[in-house]
Amino acid sequence: LKEKNPSLIIGLTGCITEKDKKKFKDKVDLIFDIKELPELEMKIKKLIKNNIEISCKIYSKQNKKNQDDDINYFHIEPKYSNKNIGYLPIMTGCNNFCSYCIVPYTRGPEISRPVKEILQEIKNLIKKKYKKIFLLGQNVNSYQSKLNNEIFDFPKLLKLINQIPGNFKINFLTSHPKDMSDELINVMAKSEKIKKELHLPIQSGDNE
């Protein structure tokens, strides 16, 4: 791509390790953490204006991720191309450290959004006529947050969502077997607005 169009700006993001950042640093113009999305426009403008390489953030084990980064990431308003399906991040990060997965190292520990914030965003999507809403998280069924000094886990959150008036269905991904429970399965079975579908990583169910 660069050979055909030298002025083309190539950016790299996602679950990128420190090793990957060093490996690709000389091959792309911009490397940024997914939680730096609010700064992306500024970085691209700076890159175009100054024609300089923008240094990427490299997190070491000594550097803690700022929780404000996650809050800013949650508040990025998505632009939907599909008028029927809405996507709603409710948590980020993972605490499981499965042997095959890099997510805990690249996305950090689990952080969940406030209950009221999630419910309000779902209501906004319903007002915009979205019929299917996906709740998103690296380990979505480990969701846990406080509301009025009460701990709300994922089954309790689904119960609240099911009570919201409107013609819509809720899906969620990605789940982890460790956080599956009889309560969650019962809530899915009894809630008319929760789709009877379950997304699980196959690797995490293999003890071998």
Residue ranges of model-derived segments:
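Conserved SAM/AdoMet-binding glycine-rich loop
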Residues: 11, 19, 126-208
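Proteins enriched for Cys/Gly/acidic motifs involved in redox and nucleic-acid/cofactor modification
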Residues: 1-143
